[in-house]
Design a protein with these regions (language model features):
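Hydrophobic, regular-secondary-structure patches
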Residues: 27, 31-106, 127-134
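Short helix-loop capping/hinge motifs at secondary-structure junctions, enriched
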Residues: 113-118
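Electropositive phosphate-/nucleotide-binding environments in soluble metabolic enzymes
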Residues: 2, 37, 41, 181
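Hydrophobic secondary-structure segments that place a key small or acidic residue at a functional site
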Residues: 91-92, 100-111, 122-197
C-alpha cells in the first residue's frame, strides 16, 4: 500500500487548489456538525436544569446521611396547600451503606400511583400494572440491574428487604438508573420497625 504513497502525494501537490478545497470543505462540515451537536446538548442540559428547578426536596436538617431523616408524612397535606405547589410526593429512603462505596444500593419508597408522574421513566421490561398492584414489587434502574444481573420476575434481597422485580427502567438522568423504586408503605414496614406515618423526605 505504501508504494502508492509517492503517486498520491504527487497528485495532491499537482492539484493543490482542489486538495485545499476538499480539506477545507471537510473541516467546515466537521465544525458545523460539532457545533450543532454542542448546541443541541446545551439546550437539552438547559431544559433539564429548568425542569429540576421546579422541584424542591425537603428532609430533616443536620443529618449526615439523608436516609436517617424522619419527617411526619402528614406534612404532605400542609405542603400541598402552599402557593405554587402542584404536587407533593412523600418518599422513604433506604440504603445499605451511607459511607462511600462502589456498590451502594438505594431504595426509594413512593406512593405507587405517583411514580410515573414524579419521574420520567421508560420501562425496558415488565409492566407498571404489576408494580402498582403488588406491595412487594419494585422497578429497578438499568444500571443497578446491570451491576447485579437482575431481571424482571426475579426476587432481590439486600439486608432485611426482599422485593419482586416488576420491571427494569431507563431514565434521561443517568443517576436515576442507580436506584430501586418500591412502594412507600412496603419500605416503611420493611426494616423490622414500624415507620408508618414518617418519611425521609417530601418532594
Amino acid at each position: 500500500m505504501f508504494k502508492f504513497a509517492p503517486y498520491l502525494l504527487k497528485t495532491l501537490w499537482r492539484h493543490r487548489s482542489r486538495t485545499i478545497l476538499t480539506v477545507s470543505g471537510s473541516a467546515v462540515a466537521l465544525f458545523v456538525f460539532c457545533f450543532v451537536g454542542a448546541v443541541q446538548r446545551g439546550m437539552n442540559d438547559l431544559e433539564t436544569r429548568q425542569e429540576s428547578k421546579q422541584s424542591l426536596v425537603m428532609f430533616q436538617a443536620n443529618k449526615f446521611c439523608p436516609a436517617t431523616s424522619n419527617l411526619p408524612q402528614d406534612y404532605e397535606e400542609k405542603i400541598a396547600k402552599l402557593p405554587g405547589v402542584r404536587d407533593v410526593v412523600p418518599i422513604q429512603v433506604y440504603t445499605n451503606n451511607c459511607r462511600a462505596s462502589l456498590d451502594v444500593i438505594v431504595f426509594y419508597g413512593v406512593p405507587p400511583k405517583k411514580l410515573q408522574t414524579a419521574r420520567d421513566f421508560k420501562l425496558l421490561s415488565g409492566s407498571w400494572a404489576e408494580f402498582e398492584q403488588n406491595q412487594d414489587a419494585a422497578v429497578v434502574g438499568r444500571a443497578v440491574a446491570g451491576r447485579r444481573g437482575l431481571k424482571t420476575g426475579e426476587k432481590f434481597s439486600i439486608g432485611p428487604l426482599t422485593v419482586q422485580i416488576a420491571g427494569v427502567y431507563s431514565s434521561n438522568d443517568p443517576a436515576e438508573e442507580n436506584y430501586i423504586y418500591s412502594h412507600l408503605e412496603f419500605l416503611q414496614r420493611g426494616k423490622n420497625e414500624d415507620l408508618v406515618g414518617t418519611v425521609t423526605q417530601h418532594e
